[in-house]
């Protein structure tokens, strides 16, 4: 692999620790594909990690991970594990979509990829047509899948899909996509281009969102290469009527 190692996530599955990340080829740093590390020890900070290689696709799947693929996340529902990732399609100015598959093992898919969302709206098409950086939070019978859209400048923002926990999560019709972003630039607070979030909990078990954003509106050159992105935290509350997560800079 190359020096391009991106978007690691730590997950605990079936009694072992796993890191899901994306990496480039040593001969082509932009040949980004998803990989897996495994640790069988109780403490992942001092345990031994083993490379499991590139994430495996289902035997009958000819398409997953053939192109630029990254930002994988994993979640569990009703005893099944699911893998969600971003992958580019097309030629020339490619489109980045989100796909989902059920997992056979922590490092191989059981099912053929299913398209979850493409950049349909104008706010997902600024600079580049992008849906990437999926993250999942589960609450009150619903599964909320957030993602990031557009280029990584000040137009970068977060969208969201929602599904019922009892629905077929591999059926695109089970998911409802928000028409507008759920979190975007707030000039009054000096926060620009929020995105690529993850969910965790604080010491008391309250949900927390970790994300990155910029503190300056002016960007010199290509936003992808501009280092002014900072890690930030946000408390998650739930809408009293709908039960959906509320993303507010006040928290």
PLM feature segments, named:
Residues 1-251:
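Carbohydrate-active catalytic/glycan-binding domains of CAZyme proteins
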């Amino acid at each position: 692999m190359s020096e391009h190692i991106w978007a690691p996530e730590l997950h605990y599955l079936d009694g072992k620790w796993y890191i899901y990340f994306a990496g480039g080829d040593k001969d082509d740093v932009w040949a980004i594909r998803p990989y897996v590390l495994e640790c069988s020890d109780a403490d992942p900070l001092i345990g031994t990690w083993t490379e499991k290689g590139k994430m495996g696709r289902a035997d009958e799947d000819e398409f997953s991970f053939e192109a630029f693929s990254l930002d994988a996340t994993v979640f569990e529902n009703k005893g099944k594990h699911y893998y969600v990732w971003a992958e580019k399609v097309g030629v020339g100015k490619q489109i980045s979509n989100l796909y989902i598959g059920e997992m056979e093992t922590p490092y191989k898919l059981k099912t053929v990829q299913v398209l979850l969302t493409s950049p349909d709206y104008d706010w997902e098409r600024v600079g580049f047509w992008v849906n990437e950086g999926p993250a999942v939070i589960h609450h009150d019978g619903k599964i909320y899948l957030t993602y990031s859209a557009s280029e990584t400048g000040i137009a970068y923002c977060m969208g969201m899909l929602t599904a019922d926990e009892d629905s077929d999560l591999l059926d695109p019709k089970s998911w409802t996509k928000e028409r507008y972003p759920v979190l975007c630039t707030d000039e009054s607070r000096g926060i620009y281009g929020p995105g690529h979030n993850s969910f965790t909990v604080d010491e008391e078990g309250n949900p927390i969102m970790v994300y990155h954003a910029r503190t300056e509106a002016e960007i010199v050159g290509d936003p992808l290469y501009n280092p002014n992105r900072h890690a930030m935290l946000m408390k998650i509350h739930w809408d009293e009527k709908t039960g959906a997560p509320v993303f507010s800079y006040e928290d």
